[in-house]
Structures are given as structure tokens and as C-alpha cells.
Design a protein with these regions (language model features):
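Polybasic/polar functional segments that serve as interface/processing modules
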Residues: 1-91
């Protein structure tokens, strides 16, 4: 079997940490990912980063509130939940 990582990255307009964490935790779980741990950092005066350790790889959130944008990135070594995540995200 060939080693492979599937990547999805996009900029979004939501920057509120609680909404981001709740929405993407649900999206990951509903797509079939197993969230093992979440590490969060709130920056002063503003900004937020969260890293989701998944049994299938990882997901990251980086906010840029001063620009009203957030960068999200999913890396997965398992195609099925990765495809479900993209489908669920786009719907």
C-alpha cells in the first residue's frame, strides 16, 4: 500500500472560537473522524488556533480576526471520512 495524505484547506469568514470549535467538532465526528484530543491557544489581543488530533491524522483552525478570516486545514490518511467531510462541509 502506498502512503498517502488527503488535504483540504479553505478560508472562511467565521472567526468566533466557540462557534468554530463546536461546528468543526460536529462536522469531523459526523464525517466519521475520531477526535482524540483538541489543543487550543487564545492569543492576545485576539486570535485563536485549535489543533484536533484525529485517529486518522489532524485538523487545524487558525483565525485572523483583524482580517475577519479563518484558515482551516484537514489532513487525513483515510479517504472515506475525508470525502464525507468535504461533502458535509459543502452542503
Amino acid at each position: 500500500m502506498k502512503a498517502q495524505i488527503h488535504n483540504f484547506a479553505v478560508w472562511i469568514n467565521e472567526t468566533r472560537p466557540a462557534a468554530l470549535k463546536e461546528n468543526f467538532s460536529s462536522l469531523l465526528t459526523n464525517s466519521g473522524f475520531e477526535v482524540l484530543e483538541v489543543v487550543e491557544k487564545h492569543f492576545e489581543p485576539y486570535g485563536y488556533t485549535a489543533l484536533f488530533l484525529l485517529s486518522e491524522s489532524h485538523f487545524a483552525i487558525h483565525t485572523f480576526p483583524e482580517h475577519e478570516e479563518t484558515y482551516i486545514e484537514l489532513s487525513s490518511c483515510v479517504l472515506e471520512p475525508f470525502n464525507k467531510f468535504i461533502k458535509n462541509y459543502e452542503s
